[in-house]
From Swiss-Prot:
Lipidation positions, renumbered (N-palmitoyl cysteine): 23
Membrane-spanning parts: none
Keywords linked to the UniProt accession: Cell membrane, Lipoprotein, Membrane, Palmitate, Signal
Cell compartments where the protein resides: Cell membrane
Protein name: Uncharacterized lipoprotein YbfP
Source organism phylogeny: Bacteria, Pseudomonadati, Pseudomonadota, Gammaproteobacteria, Enterobacterales
GO-annotated cellular components: plasma membrane
Lipid moiety-binding residues (S-diacylglycerol cysteine): 23
Gene (UniProt): ybfP
Signal peptide: 1-22
Domain of life: Bacteria
Membrane topology: Lipid-anchor
Length: 164
């Protein structure tokens, strides 16, 4: 049981920053709501889905020492007892070259989150197709598909996954 909890904590912390950077304007709320995160690269050792809630957030003062002015737009990701805040960094020109048309990504620290048309390939020279139109990637985790939940707190989706 401790291994499963550790996995959930690791995945939620790794993906927290990743997920929260998908849109330049948190108020547009394209990421706001309940999401199911599923690592797609089974060879990297992380399996299983976790449920998270993403909400816009504005830090007023003492904003975690992130060297940004107070009141900078951020996302807050909550999963279980974990909460994480993040902010945006635009991706480099070299990173943009690797994307197919219609996809836009943002990086935060060493991760990125991308948004585009569902059912299309976001990355040039990659076979991965995003089912939902949202995905994240990180060097040590690989690709994580983001899927919007239909039930409150993703409970029905998690139950269906855990029974298979």
């Amino acid at each position: 049981m401790k291994t499963n909890r550790s996995l959930v904590v690791i995945v939620s912390l790794i993906t927290a920053t990743l997920l929260l950077t998908a849109c330049a304007q948190p108020e547009q709320s394209s990421l706001a709501g309940d999401w199911l995160l599923t690592p797609k690269d089974k060879t990297r050792g992380l399996t299983g889905s976790i449920a998270v809630n993403i909400a816009p957030f504005r830090c007023k003062t003492n904003c975690r020492g992130d060297n940004l002015p107070d009141n900078t737009r951020r996302w807050q990701l909550s999963g279980g007892n974990e909460k994480e805040l993040t902010y945006l960094h635009n991706m480099s020109a070299q990173e943009k070259v690797g994307l197919n048309p219609g996809w836009q990504c943002y990086t935060s620290f060493f991760m990125r989150v991308c948004q585009g048309k569902p059912g299309t390939r976001p990355i040039v020279n990659e076979d991965y197709v995003s089912e939902s139109g949202f995905f994240g990637s990180m060097m040590h985790v690989g690709i994580i598909e983001l899927r919007r939940c239909q039930s409150e707190n993703c409970q029905q989706e998690l139950k269906a996954i855990n029974t298979h």
